[in-house]
Amino acid sequence: MSALIHDGVSRLAELDNGILKLQLALDRDNIFKSLMFKGQELILIKPENYASDERPTCGCPVLFPYSGNNQEGLLHLGDECYQSGIHGIAHSLVWEICTFAESSITLSTHATQKTKETYPFDFCLQSKLSLNENGLRYELTAKNESECVMPCDLGLHPFFLNPDLNKTIFTGEFMDGRKLTNEDLDFDRICKSGFLCEQLRVLKCILPNGIQLTFNNLEGFVNTLVWSGDPHRFMVIEPLS
């Protein structure tokens, strides 16, 4: 089932297959307003932040054309420097629906005069999200619509509810077949700047409440950052290019 509604802040595109239910806030960087599995909410939403004009710090923001902070708050492109904030510019964009089916949706957004003040390129971002019985597939692409080379990175920043990071069981597999366990993770770093797992293919997390989350990186996304600003409230699993 699919639907388009409004919650007073943003248009919401909704997909529901009876097991998974997803709501996307099109006017708030296409973030997840909700992701429910068998009636249980998986995603953190901060109502005050969501209802504001500030950069989303909840849901699942898109990271483009970079993640994190640039040195001295400046983006260096050739001989030019541009003021840059955290996690790029996509958080200021409104998304529009391209196709909307029973269990999938494709959306896009484009450069604006405002984004060109800090990132002087024409671009198109497209996201395709589809539900299956027990999973969500998120395909995110960036297209250069400028006449010159457009340097960029791409990523996602999903905030998953987690009552106790220290009681979470992590396992995974790298591209070369090596395995990952809790012993490979630095939980102090996770709670500060984040812990980067390079060349990670799969990451599995068993939460204290018994929910198991499995993340399979799609082609082009070769790194995964694990971070938490509140280890008794949420964790972020960032797929990064």
Question: Residue ranges of each PLM-predicted region?
Answer:
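A short, structured loop/turn motif at beta-sheet edges
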Residues: C98-I105, S130-G135, N162-T168, P208, ...
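Extended, loop-rich substrate-binding clefts of extracytoplasmic carbohydrate-active enzymes
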Residues: M1-D7, D16, G78-E133
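Hydrophobic residues embedded in beta-strands of well-ordered beta-sheets
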Residues: A13, S104-I105, L136-Y138, L203
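Structural motif
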Residues: K21, L74, C81, S104, ...
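Acidic, contiguous internal or C-terminal segments within carbohydrate-active enzymes
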Residues: L15, L26, T109-C152, L156-P158, ...
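Beta-strand-rich N-terminal accessory domains
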Residues: M1-L74, C81, Q199-E219
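Active-site/ligand-binding surface loops and adjacent short beta/alpha elements
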Residues: C148-D153, P158-G220
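Active-site pocket scaffolds in enzymes
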Residues: Q212-S241
